[in-house]
Amino acid sequence: MTWQSDYSRDYEVKNHMECQNRSDKYIWSPHDAYFYKGLSELIVDIDRLIYLSLEKIRKDFVFINLNTDSLSEFINRDNEWLSAVKGKQVVLIAARKSEALANYWYYNSNIRGVVYAGLSRDIRKELAYVINGRFLRKDIKKDKITDREMEIIRMTAQGMQPKSIARIENCSVKTVYTHRRNAEAKLYSKIYKLVQ
């Protein structure tokens, strides 16, 4: 069975997080047929650039598409998906608006690397670079979300108002707005638009 056929039979999964909690999925989100097919073909295409066999990649790696459509799931349930991929080599494929979040998860969990889809001149080389284990902290191309900003993003995603967040975080409402504004600058978008 080929790499592509392994993936093509699975991309009909309807529930994004249901798919994520299954340990037999290697490309999240498989319900995004274009991403799924494109990444599968790309990995086969870069076979000569990577040191590992395609079978080892299929078995040991998880490739996660951090796009604006799935971002709220990843923000609201980051503890769940991070524990679901424990023991796997996680590669985040980050769109422009999710780069700062990808960097946050890279710094704060066991992520192998980040492929910056929007900045890459040659995504094949970027992907091979990460798969081969060469991605390092020095390769981070942008700011990351801070822990405090992430807490405020999570609470905002849950529908909490700044006043409630300020009470929980034991800070002023002005501080909440400042952290939110800083996070939005790093994400190139208003938080509420990303988590709808």
Curated annotation (Swiss-Prot):
Residue ranges annotated for the HTH luxR-type domain, each copy included: 138-196
Induction conditions: Negatively regulated by H-NS. Positively autoregulated. Also positively regulated by IHF.
Localization of this protein: Cytoplasm
InterPro entries registered for this protein in UniProt: Sig_transdc_resp-reg_C-effctor, Tscrpt_reg_LuxR_C, WH-like_DNA-bd_sf
GO biological process, one term: regulation of DNA-templated transcription
DNA-binding region: 162-181
Any GO MF annotation of the entry: DNA binding
Cross-referenced Pfam families: GerE
Record keywords: Activator, Cytoplasm, DNA-binding, Transcription, Transcription regulation
Family: Belongs to the EcpR/MatA family.
Protein name per the record: HTH-type transcriptional regulator EcpR
Organism: Escherichia coli (strain 55989 / EAEC)
